[in-house]
Amino acid sequence: MPQLDQFTYLTQFVWLCVFYMTFYVLLYNDGLPKISRIIKLRKRLVSQEKVGAEQSNDRVEQDVVFKECFQASANYLYSSVSGASKWCKGMVQLANAHKLQRMNKDYVCSLGEISVSQVIKKNALSTLSPSTYQTTSLASRQTTALNKIYVLRGQKRTLAKIKNGPRKKKIS
């Protein structure tokens, strides 16, 4: 066997030691630190996965809490808005029933007086000059004739109230 020859044996042994030593040095300086870093990183990732699982549970719990809080705030906002609208409707009904009742009554009375005065104007115009009123077809003549008839006393009072403003009650 030529490999185990005395002449080549020494050189082969030297080269074998050189290659093993360089391999050992390279592995010791470069390989082992990289391997140890990888092992440490894996340990850290495994521990973080355990903590991450706990954190993911915390995140799920936070999402549930946020969802409940948002629903509660939306419900509160809806109830406050609906309560405010109910209060406004109640105040309007109260104002119409008590405070504005006189004004509403005066308004209805004035509407009635206006309609009655229109009927009276037509009747008065037809009795005063039936031939002129019935034969005249021009709208302008009818309007001027109706406007010449005087206004009822109730309408005069209403107009006076509007012009002068509401009367203040005297305290006795």
Curated annotation (Swiss-Prot):
Chain segments annotated as transmembrane: 13-29
InterPro entries cross-referenced by the UniProt entry: YMF19-like, YMF19-like_N
Cystine bridges: none
Enzyme class at the top of the EC tree: translocase
Membrane topology: Single-pass membrane protein
Compartments (UniProt record): Mitochondrion membrane
Any one GO cellular component localisation term in the record: mitochondrial membrane
GO BP: ATP biosynthetic process; proton transmembrane transport
Keywords: ATP synthesis, ATP-binding, CF(0), Hydrogen ion transport, Ion transport, Membrane, Mitochondrion, Nucleotide-binding, Translocase, Transmembrane, Transmembrane helix, Transport
Statement: the UniProt record of this protein carries the keyword Lyase: no
Enzyme Commission number(s) of this protein: 7.1.2.2
GO molecular function, one term: ATP binding
Swiss-Prot/TrEMBL catalytic activity: ATP + H2O + 4 H(+)(in) = ADP + phosphate + 5 H(+)(out)
Similarity comment: Belongs to the ATPase protein YMF19 family.
Functional note: This is one of the chains of the nonenzymatic component (CF(0) subunit) of the mitochondrial ATPase complex.
Assembly behavior: F-type ATPases have 2 components, CF(1) - the catalytic core - and CF(0) - the membrane proton channel. CF(1) has five subunits: alpha(3), beta(3), gamma(1), delta(1), epsilon(1). CF(0) has three main subunits: a, b and c.
Name used for this protein in its record: Putative ATP synthase protein YMF19
Naturally occurring in which organism (per UniProt): Marchantia polymorpha
Gene name as annotated: YMF19
